From Swiss-Prot:
3-methyl-2-oxobutanoate binds at D44, S45, D83, K112. Its EC number is 2.1.2.11. PANTHER family: 3-METHYL-2-OXOBUTANOATE HYDROXYMETHYLTRANSFERASE. Its cofactor is Mg(2+). Catalyzes the reversible reaction in which hydroxymethyl group from 5,10-methylenetetrahydrofolate is transferred onto alpha-ketoisovalerate to form ketopantoate. This is 3-methyl-2-oxobutanoate hydroxymethyltransferase. The gene is panB. The lineage of its organism: Archaea, Thermoproteota, Thermoprotei, Sulfolobales, Sulfolobaceae. It catalyses: 3-methyl-2-oxobutanoate + (6R)-5,10-methylene-5,6,7,8-tetrahydrofolate + H2O = 2-dehydropantoate + (6S)-5,6,7,8-tetrahydrofolate.
């Protein structure tokens, strides 16, 4: 099965909605690789959803490398984009290029950076050295402290300026997070590269959701997500039945073990 490419994403602009899911591990990526979803984002949100950190700020390159390897091994078809974690690109162009190259060598088809005008040089240098970049504007979780928390971003002029700067720097796509739908629509119309929304309305070229939110596995259900399954409840019920079967002696059943008499 042929993996989707950057060119495939670009061709979908304004024609076919792009679907992406944030995924972190081999077993989940293996299941999802058998669907028609277009791309996987190995997100630094693994800090909260997998590692139990309070935010994305504690996530390191080692964490991202580990989870990138797992997802890559499971995914023959989907385009794989990997978040560059906090302080893996901010210090200098050289640091940014080096770390982007490491993620690419582990199988990432592209990397994602948070920020707009302020990361122009980082994006341009990473692209120049051969690693595709997806931008990320609006609510940028790595900068939530300076934003005063996880708030809807309303500065239309800055958002448009950020999007245009990312496109000029060579980004092939832009994630727009937690922005008014009308602003996301304007950005989508102004740039020639695909926009991917999360909490920014229906007018982008595509959507991305965290698989934990889609399956109802998280502690908090974000307003912008849709829970397609209450997997947390189903897991609890399955474990409850297992415990009951063990205590009542109905597990293991005769079909679950071997004996000399069989």
């Amino acid at each position: 099965m042929q993996r989707l490419t950057i060119r495939d994403f670009l061709k979908k602009k304004g024609k076919e909605k792009i679907t992406m899911l944030t995924v972190y591990d081999y077993s989940m990526a293996k299941i999802l690789s058998e669907t028609e979803v277009d791309g996987f984002l190995v997100g630094d949100s693994l800090g909260m959803n997998v590692l139990g950190f309070p935010s994305t700020l504690q996530v390191t390159m080692d964490h991202m490398i580990h989870h990138t390897r797992a997802v890559v091994r499971a995914s023959p078809r989907q385009l794989i984009v990997v978040d560059m974690p906090f302080m893996s690109y901010e210090p200098s162009n050289e640091v940014a290029v080096k770390n982007a190259g490491i993620l690419a060598s582990e199988g990432a088809d592209a990397v994602k950076l948070e920020g707009g005008v302020e990361v122009y040089e980082r994006v341009a240098n990473i692209v120049k050295f051969g690693v595709p970049v997806m931008g990320h504007i609006g609510l940028t979780p790595q900068r939530y402290l300076t934003l005063g928390g996880y708030r809807t971003v309303k500065d239309e002029a800055k958002l448009i300026s950020d999007a245009l700067a990312l496109e000029e720097a060579g980004a092939f796509s832009i994630v727009i997070e937690n922005v008014y739908a009308e602003i996301a629509k304007k950005i989508t119309e102004k740039v020639s590269i695909p926009t991917i929304c999360i909490g920014a309305g229906p007018h982008c070229d595509g959507q991305v959701l965290v698989i934990h939110d889609l399956l109802g596995m998280g502690d908090i259900q974000p307003y912008f997500s849709r829970k397609y399954l209450d997997l947390k409840a189903e897991i609890r019920e399955a474990v409850k039945r297992y415990i009951n079967d063990v205590k009542t002696g109905t597990f293991p059943g005769r079909e679950n073990y071997k004996s000399r008499e069989s």
